Amino acid sequence: MALPTAAGVISSGLAAYPAIYYDRVALETLRSNLFLYPACDLKQMPDKSGVAMQIFDYSALQANTVAATEGAPNGNGVTLTQNVRTLTLSNYVDYVSFSNKVVLTAISDTVAEGAAELAYRGALTVDTVISTLLDSVANGDASCRIDVNDGSYMSAAKSRQAQMSLRSVNVKPKANGSFYGVLPSVMAFDLINDSSTGGFIDLFKYTDSQKANLEVPASNRIGIVGGVEWFESNALPTETNWQTTSHTAYHAYVIGKNGLIASSLGKTQLAQKNFAVKVSKFDTPIAVDPANQIAAAASYNFFFGVVQRTGSTNGFRRIRSESSIG
C-alpha cells in the first residue's frame, strides 16, 4: 500500500487546536529606579500629634574680635537666633479593585501583580513630591542652580562644582563622607564618558573597572565622583526647549546632610507599615456591592511630607544639562 503524499490531519482542520499559548508570568514592568527618598534625613512624627512638625536650627555666631576690658563685664553677652520651618504631612491614597471574574478566571495572580504595580506608584509619588520641592526651591534661589551651557554636558567638573559649592556655605556631606547625587541615565552616560583631563575616564583609567564601578552595576550606583556618590534614576524632571528649541534639559540633584527633611506618621521607612500596600479580599457581600462582584482590592494610604533645611542657606544643588545622547 502506497503511503499518502500529505498528512490527512493538520492543525488547520482541528477546531479545538490551540492557536495561542498564554504565558502565565508577566514580563518585568519598565519602572524607574527611585533614589530621592534615601537622600532625605528622616524625622518621626508621633501619632496623635497633628500633621505639622516645626523643625529648627540656630544661626552660627560670628567671631568677637573686641578684647575685653579688665574688670568690666561684657554687657549682656550675645543672643541666639533660631530658624524654623514647618513640615506638613499630606495624605496619599490610591487603590486597584478586581472583579470576581478576574480573580476566579485570570491565568495569573492579577491581584498580586496589581499590588506590585501599585507599590511602585506609591514610591514614585514620594520621589515626585521630593523632586517637585527641589525644583520649587531651586527656581527661587540662584545659589542652588548649576546650569550647563548649550553644547556642553554633565562632567566630573560639574560634580566637583556642586560639592564645593555646598561646602563653601558649610553644608556637610552625608554620614558616609560623600554628598548624595541622583541623575538620569542620559546624564550618567555623559558623566562616565567624560574623557577630559580630570574627567571620569582620566580619574579611573588605571583602576580596576569593577573596583571603580566603571561598569554600572544592577544597583544603579554610578560611583563617587568629586565627592558625590551618584545614583541613576529616570524618574527625574525634564524641560523642553532648553536654551534652544531642539534640546531637552535633564535635572540632577546633589544633596548634603539635612538638605532635605522628611517625615511620615509613626513609621518612617518605606518597608514599614506607613508605606505598605494592603491587599484585601472580599468574601461576603456589602451594601455597595450586594452581588459581591468586586472580589479583591490593593490599596495604599500613607502620610508624607518633605521640606528643605531651615534658614536661608539651602543644602542642595540642582544641575540642569542637555545630554549628548538624549
Residue positions per predicted region:
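Polar-ligand-bearing catalytic/cofactor-coordination segments
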Residues: 181
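Disorder-to-helix initiation segments
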Residues: 7-14, 100-107, 111
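Short acidic, glycine/tyrosine-flanked loop/strand segments centered on an H-E-D-like triad
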Residues: 79-106, 271, 278
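Short, solvent-exposed loop/turn elements at domain surfaces
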Residues: 62-66, 190-191, 240
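Alpha-helical scaffold segments that mediate packing/assembly in large oligomeric complexes
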Residues: 105-174, 185-192, 324-326
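Short gly/pro-enriched beta-turn/loop segments at secondary-structure junctions
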Residues: 172-178, 223-228
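Sequence/fold signature of self-assembling virion shell proteins
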Residues: 2-39, 151-161, 193-326
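N-terminal "assembly arms/tails" that initiate or stabilize quaternary assembly
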Residues: 1-88, 313
